[in-house]
């Protein structure tokens, strides 16, 4: 996270995305340099057809500065940040776009709008946030959930989060993911709710065919470091 190396999307994810090439994507508040660079990369790989939402003058100026030709793409002029989220949610609700991409906008503003039922974007499953990371000298990704969406989730919500991430793993060709239900300890303690939740989640998961190896409670260091787990006698 503190690395100054260029961010590169893993080849295997690009290969999977190839099956969905050219999907229309609403870029929410697209006028800043960072989201525009991401759009450039995505267009270069022919992954999306962007619909650029934001201040039209700023969008065109940023693209021009980056020598990025956006003349073929739809631009919706909306200079007010909060309103860009409304435009994107309506486009998705109406079926005009298949994907909503967060540009230069606060997450809470975007999600507050997307979650409104009037747009019909919410299905039966609870939404959750998934953070996919690739690490140097590692051939397996590290995936963390939920880091940004559900606040103080109970066991029922955590089960939704668990099923969402397992489904995501299966979709990116991880046939049987290893899942750690995190707590600050490996012991089940009455004084630590997260450890009690982890135990209950593992028990519930055993009763369902989730096609994943699920362990918990486990501390984060023991989940990501084999050496750390060995020191604590965890196999």
Predicted regions and their residues:
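Anion-binding alpha/beta catalytic cores of soluble intermediary-metabolism enzymes, centered on
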Residues: 1-52, 56-235
């Amino acid at each position: 996270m503190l690395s100054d190396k260029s961010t590169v999307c893993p080849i295997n994810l690009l290969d999977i995305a190839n099956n969905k090439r050219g999907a229309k994507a609403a870029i929410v508040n697209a006028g800043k340099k960072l989201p525009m660079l991401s759009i450039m990369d995505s267009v270069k790989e022919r992954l999306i057809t962007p619909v650029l939402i934001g201040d039209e003058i700023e969008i065109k100026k940023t693209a021009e500065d980056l020598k990025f030709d956006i003349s073929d793409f739809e631009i919706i002029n909306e200079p007010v940040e909060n309103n860009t989220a409304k435009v994107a949610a309506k486009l998705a609700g109406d079926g005009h776009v298949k994907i909503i991409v967060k540009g230069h906008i606060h997450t809470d503003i975007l999600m507050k709008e997307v979650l409104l039922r009037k747009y019909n974007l919410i299905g039966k499953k609870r939404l959750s946030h998934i953070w996919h990371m690739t690490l140097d000298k590692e051939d397996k990704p590290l995936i963390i959930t939920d880091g940004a969406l559900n606040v103080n989730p109970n066991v029922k919500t955590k089960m939704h989060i668990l099923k969402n991430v397992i489904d995501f793993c299966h979709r990116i060709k991880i046939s049987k993911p290893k899942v750690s239900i995190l707590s600050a300890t490996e012991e089940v303690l009455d004084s630590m709710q997260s450890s009690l939740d982890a135990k209950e989640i593992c028990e519930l998961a055993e009763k369902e065919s989730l096609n994943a190896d699920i362990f918990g409670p486990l501390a984060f260091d023991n989940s990501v470091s084999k050496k750390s787990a060995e020191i604590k006698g965890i196999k």
